[in-house]
Amino acid sequence: MYNPYQQQGMGYQQQQQQQQQQPNGFYPQQQQGQSSNQPQGQPQPQQQMAFNQPQATGIGGMPQSFGNSFSSMPQQPQTGYNNNGNNGSVYGNGNFGQQPQQQQQQAKPQHTGYVPNSSMPMMNTTGTMPPPNPAQQPQLQSIQPQGTGYYQAANTANVHSVQPLQSQGTGYYVSTPNLISSNQTQQPLQAQGTGYYQSQPQQVPPPQQAQSLQPLKPQQTGFYLQPQNQAPLEPLKPTATGFVNSFANNGLNNDIKIPAIRLSFITAQDQAKFETLFRSIVTNGSNTVSGANCRKILMRSGLPPSQLARIWTLCDTSKAGELLFPEFALAMHLINDVLQGDTIPYELDSKTKNEVSSFIDAINLSIANQDSSANDAPKTPFDEFITAGVQNLQPQPTGYMPQTSFGIPLQSQITGGGVASALNPQSTGFMAPTTFNMSMNTGTPGLNPQITGGAPASMQPNITGNALQPQTTGMMPQTTGMMPQTTGMMPQTSFGVNLGPQLTGGALQSQYTGGYGSVMPQQSGPASMPNLSFNQQGLQSQLTGLQPQPTGFLPPSNFSATMPLTAQKTGFGNNEIYTKSNFNNNLIDNSSQDKISTEEKSLFYKIFETFDTQNKGLLDSPTAVEIFRKSGLNRADLEQIWNLCDINNTGQLNKQEFALGMHLVYGKLNGKPIPNVLPSSLIPSSTKLLDNLKNQLKTEPTTTKEKPSFGKIDALSYKNNDDDVLPNYRNRRKVYSAKNEEQSSFSSPSAKSVNHSSSTLQTDDISVDKTVEKKTAKPKYAGFSREINLKNIASLENEIKNISNPENCYDSSIPSDLTSRFDAIIAKLPNLFNEISTIDNEITNAKIQLYRKKNPSSIIGSGPNGEITENDRKKAKSRALLRARMSALTGKSTESEDSLSMEDEQQSAEIKRIQQENGKNQEIIKDIRSSISDISASLKSTMTGSNMISNQEFERWEFGIGLEDGVREFLDDLKSNSNKSVTESSPFVPSSTPTPVDDRSSSPSYSQFKTAEERAAYLKEQAKKRMKEKLAKFDKNRRNVTQSSRSISSENSREQPQQIAGSSNLVEPRATPFQEEKYVEVAQPTQPVQSTQPVQPTQPVQPTQPVQPTQPVQPTQPVQPTQPVQNVYNAKQESDDEDEDDEEKRLQEELKRLKLKKKADKEKRLAALRKQIEDAQNESDEEETNGKDNFGGHVNVPQAAPVAPSAAFSQNSTNAPRSVHAAVTPAAGKNSTGLPSTTMGHNPYFKDASASSTSTFDARAAEMQRRIQRGLDEDEDDGWSDEDESNNRVAVDNKVEEAKIGHPDHARAPPVTAAPLPSVTPVPPAVPVPQANTSNEKSSPIPIAPIPPSVTQEPPVPLAPPLPAVDGFQEPPIPSAPAIATAVQKSGSSTPALAGGVLPPPPPLPTQQASTSEPIIAHVDNYNGAEKGTGAYGSDSDDDVLSIPESVGTDEEEEGAQPVSTAGIPSIPPAGIPPPPPLP
C-alpha cells in the first residue's frame, strides 16, 4: 500500500555518495553495493537507475513518487505519460541543466503493447543520442535488455558503452533471447523474465567489472515477516501499526490448517484479521488458543470481566477451555458488538451455532486426514529452480500478507548474489507457491530472467525504447536492474487486463506504468489512465537502468499510525477479502463525517432538560438563543447556527435540534467552519423519519387506487378509503334514500335480513334491552357499501325465490298425506324444542329462587335474575366489617366474615349445581334433536330421492341451527311459500342460559306475509289479539290496584282466589308483556273476590256472584262489546304502522312492568308490618259498613279498602271510623289512579298505583291544608267554596258533554256532588264495569247495574252519618272533582272499561237532590271527576289519595250510593240517605 504522507526523495543529491537504495519492502535501501564500488565518472547508468520509478511487485508494493530535486541528473530516459513532456511538468527542465545533452538522449516512451518481439533484434531506443562524454563511456556499459515479461531471457552479447539501452521486456510472458549487437566493457543487464512460468536458461557472459557492483543484499518486502538481522537494515524496520499487527510482528503460526470457509456473521475483512490474530497467538503444534493467551487479547477490549466471562461461555462450545478459530472469531465478533453498543445475547442463534459447529467439524476432518507430507509445499513446474545454485543469498519474503486460508503463502525470494545462479521463481499469480530461481548479477552481465507472473510462457519481449510510457509491471517489490518490478497496486494477472509483451523497440502499443501513486490494475490501451487515490503526485519518469528503486512499502518514519495496512489480493481466487477499496471508503467516510458523539448528546440532553422546566419537549427561541449566546459567538454565526438547527422553522427547538445547535456552537469554538447545509450525519433522526415518510407519500402512485370491494375484508389487509365517505351532495342524497328505503320497506327481504330484531327470539330481559339498543342505534348516515349490500342481498333472494328447486319434489310413489305429515312434523319440531328448552330454563330459575327463599342470604344480589355480583360481595364484606367494628365498640357479638364467605360459597355451589343440571338437560335436548334430525334427513333423502344429507346440514337448513337471523327468516319465507300447508315457525335457537318464556317468540311478523289474503288474516288475528290484550290490561289494572291488598293479606290466604292472585303476582315480574291473555283468565275471577273480601267479609257472596266464574260474563260482556269497537277502529287506523310500532310499544310496556315490579317489591316489604293492622282495620271497617252504611259496600270499596286502610291507619290509628273512611277514600282514589295507570302507559300517573301503600305522607295534615286552600271549611267562609262549586260545575258540564251523557243541567248541581265526591272515591273500583258501559254506550250497562246496587245498598248508610259528624265542612273538596273528571274522560275515551270502572260511584250524589236518573248520571260524572281529581293529585304522590277529607267521603258515600244504584236499577230509593251537608 502506498503511504501518501511519506516523502520519497530519492533524488540525485544522494547518488554521489551512494547509489539509490532499493526499498523493496519495508526496508528500502538495502542494497548499496552497486554504487559504492563504482567510480564517480559513470553517472549515467547510475543516474538512470536512481531515476527508475518504484515498481511495486509485492502485494503491498506501490510506486513511490520522487521529489523534483534532480539538479545533478545526467541522462535520464523519461518513460512518463507524455514522453518527454513530463520532464518539464513533473521535474522541470531546469533540473537537468548540468547535462542538457543527456536529457536529449532520454529514452522515448516505452510501448508496452502485445506485439511479439521474439524474432526482432532488440533496439535500445532509450538512448537515441550518444552521450557527449566519450571518456566515461567505457565505464558506462549500456543496459542489457532486461526481460521483465514471462518469457525467458536469452543470452545477450556485450554492447559498447555508446550503445543505447537494450530493450527491457516487461510483459508477463517468457522472454525470448535478446540479440544485442554491441559489445562493451561492462556487460549490460541481462533480460529478466518476470513471468510466471519457467524461464529458459539464459546465456550469461562472464562478469566484467564485477567490482563496480556488489551483489544485492537480501530484501524483505513483506509486511509481517521478521526482517533479516543485518546491521544496515536495522534502523529501517517497519513499524507495525494496529492491534492485529502488533501481534503479527511476533510471528505467525502458519502450520495451522484452517479450512477456507466463510463465516456469515462477520465480514470477510474481519475474518482475515481475526485469522491473522489467531495465528499469532496459537502455539506451535496446536490448533487452539489457550484460555490464558485468549484472555490477554480479550482483556484489551476494555470490557468488564463479567461480560467477557459470558462471551467465553457462549463461544467455548466444546467446553474444552480452549478456542478453535471459529470460536475465537465468534468471541471477537461478540466483543465488537458490545463495544458498538449491542448487548450480549443469552443464547446464540441457531444459524451462528450451525456455522461454528460445521467449521469445527471441517477443522477436525482436516486434522484427521492430514499426513506428514501435508505440510510440504505443493509441487510446481518451477520446483527445479528452488535449489539451483543460489549462493550467499538469504531468502527474501516479498509478500505483504500472511499465510492465510485464503491464499497460498508466498515463497521466499532470493534477489541478490554475485553468482550467476538462478533466482528462485516466485509465483505472483494465482496460488502457485513457487519461488524465484533466476539469479541476477548486479554489475555482471546477463542476469537470469525472473518469473513473477502467471501468463503463458510464450510472451514476447517488450521494447523499452521509442516513447515507452511509464508502466507498472508486477506486484512483487523488486529492484530494477535486478528484476522487473511492478509499481502498481493490484496484481497484473487474472484480473481482466493482462499486460501484453512489451518490446523495447518498435511502434507498439504503449502501456502506462503509472503517473500517479496507488496505480490501479493496468490497462494496456494507449490512452488509458490509471485511477488515482489519496491525491498522490504523479510518478516521475522512469529509467530502465540499474539505479536502486524503492518498490515496497516506504520506511515508517512518517507513516501514519491511524492507517492500518490492508493486505492486497494476489490471485484470482482471493475474493474481496483484502480489497483496499473497502477500507479506503470507510476511512474517508469516517474521517469526513461530522457526528454528535454519545457523550455530547448526553451532555446536551441534560442541559436541555434543565431548561425545559415544563417538560414540553421544546425550548422556545428566547431560552435557546440565550444559551447559544453564552458561547460568545458573533451574531452572524449564531443566526447561521439557528437556521441550521430550526429545521422546520417553528421557532422552537426539540431535544435533538438543541443538541445539534450545541454541537455546531462547540465546533465553531474549536475552529471548525459552520456548514452551509447540514450534512446527512448531523440531520436529526426524527427529521429523517419525517422526510422519508413525506417522500414515500409523494412518490406513492395515486393512480393505482382500487375500487372498494364489498366482500369480506380482512382486518390485517384492511385499508380505509377516505374517498368513500366524502360529504358531497350525491352521497348525501343516496344516504337519505337508502335510509328511507330501509324504513319504508320492512316487508322487503333485504330489510328483513338487516332489521331482524322484531322476529328474533327474545328469551330474557337482557335480550329485550339489546333489541331496544339495536333499534335505536341505527347509524344516522349509512354508507354506500350498506346500501349496495342490501340491494345485492335483495336481488340474490329474488333470484333464489324464482329458481325452482327440484330437490324438494317428493317421489310420486309416496302418498301426499305422508309427505304433508312429514312436512308438518318438521315444521313443528323447532318450536317444540324451543319450548322444551325454555321450560327447562324456567325450571332452573325456579329452583334457584326456591333455594334462595329457603336459604336467604345476607348478600342482596343486584345482578340479572337476582344473581350476586362481585360488587354485592364487596358491599356485604364492607357491611360485615362495619358491624364487626361496631360490635367491638358495643361489646355485642356479630357474624364473622368467615360465615359470610361460607354462606356465599354454599349458595354459589348450589346455584352452580342447578345450572349444571340445566346444562346436562340442554345437552340431552341437543342429542335428541340431533337424532331426530338424523332420522329426518334419511327420510327426506328417501322421499325426495336425493343424496343423503348430513345431520349437521339438516339441522342447519331445516331447524336453523347456526344460521344468521336474516338467513333463517329467508328460509322460513321459502318454506312458507313452498309449503302453504305448513304453519310458519321460527327456527329453534337453544339458549344455554335460563331465560323466561316469551310467547311472542313464535309469532310471525306482518312483513313475513306476501299475499293480501295472508295479510288480511294476519290483521284479523292481530285485532283479536289486541282485544284480548286490552281485556287483559283492564283486568290487570284492577288487579294492580288490589295487588297491595293481596300482598298484605297473602299470608292469611283466606280464600283460594287470593292465593291465585298472589301466585300470579309472583310470576308477573318475570313474565313478558305479551302474556296478557293469561292474565285475563286468572284475573277476572280473582279481582272481584279480593276486592270484596278485605273490606266486607260479611257480603263476599254478592260481589262474587256477578264476578265469579258463574257470572264472569256480566263484566266481560259490557267490556267486550266496547273493546271490539275500539279494536276495529285501531285496526283500521293502525293497520299500516302497527307492525312498526307494536314492538316498541311492547318494549315500553315491558319497561313499565319492570318498574311496577320494583314497586310491588317495596309493597311486599311492608306487608308484614301492615298485616296485623289491616286485619284489625278490616274487621272494624266491616262492622261499620254493615251497621251504618249500606251503600259503602260497593265493589269499589272492597278494592280500595285493602290498600288505603293500611296507609291511612298507619298514620292515624286512633280514630277507627276516620281510619275506615280514610281507607275507603284513598282506595277509591287509588283505584281511579290505578285504572288509568294500568292502561299501559297512556296515563302518566300510572306509576303510583302500586306505590300508594308505601307512602308516608301525613293524610290529616294534607287534608287540613287542602281544606283551607279550597275553602271547604264551613266555619271559614271566605268565598273560595263558591268558586270551587262553579269550577266543579263547569268541569262536570264539560265531562258530561264529552262523555255524551247529555245532562249538563244536572251536572251543574255540584253542591251535593262536591262534598260527596272525595268521600265516595272508594266506589269506583266496583262500578268500573257498569260505567264503562254508560260512558261508551248505554245499552251495555244493564248487566253491570245489578252488581253495584247489591254491593252499594249495604255500606252507604253506615258510612254517611260518621262523615258529617266528624267534619261537616268537608263538602267543599269539589275542586278536586273537576280535574278528576277530565282524567276520567280521558281514560274513558281511551279505554271504556277503565272509565266505566271509575264512573259508577258518582251517580248516588245527584239522586239525593233529584230522583231522576239524569241528575244521577251527572253526579256520577261529578263523582268520577272528583275521584279522578284525587287520583290526579295522588298520582304524583301516594298520599294525595289519603289527603281527601274523610268526613266528606262519608257524606258522599251516603248520598252517592243511592244514585249509583238508581243509575243501574231505579228501584233503589234515595230517601234513605240523609241530605248532604249544606253547600256554600
UniProtKB/Swiss-Prot annotation:
Xref: PROSITE patterns: EF_HAND_2, EH
Region (7 X 6 AA tandem repeats of Q-[PS]-T-Q-P-V): 1084-1125
Keyword Phosphoprotein found: yes
EH domain ranges (all copies): 270-359, 600-689
Record CDD domains: EH
Modification sites for Phosphothreonine: 241, 570, 993, 995, 1321
Subcellular location: Cell membrane; Endosome membrane; Cytoplasm, Cytoskeleton, Actin patch
Disulfide topology: none
Coiled-coil spans in chain: 1131-1190
Domain EF-hand span(s) in chain numbering: 269-304, 306-338, 633-668
Binding of Ca(2+), residues: 646, 648, 650, 652, 657
Annotated region (15 X 12 AA tandem repeats of [SPNAG]-[IL]-[QKNGT]-[PSA]-[QT]-[GQAPISTLYK]-T-G-[YFGML]-[YVMGAQL]-[QVLNPAG]-[ASQPN]), positions in chain: 142-575
Primary localization: membrane
UniProt feature, compositional bias: Low complexity: 1-56, 80-110, 117-128, 136-146, 981-996, 1084-1126, 1195-1208, 1248-1259, 1309-1318
GO biological process: actin cortical patch assembly; axial cellular bud site selection; bipolar cellular bud site selection; cell wall organization; endocytosis; endosomal transport; positive regulation of Arp2/3 complex-mediated actin nucleation; reticulophagy
Modified-residue entries (Phosphoserine), positions: 747, 757, 1003, 1180, 1250, 1253, 1281
Biased composition, class Polar residues, residue ranges: 65-79, 185-197, 743-765, 1056-1066, 1230-1241
Biased composition regions of type Pro residues, renumbered to the chain: 1319-1328, 1343-1364, 1467-1480
The protein, known as: Actin cytoskeleton-regulatory complex protein PAN1
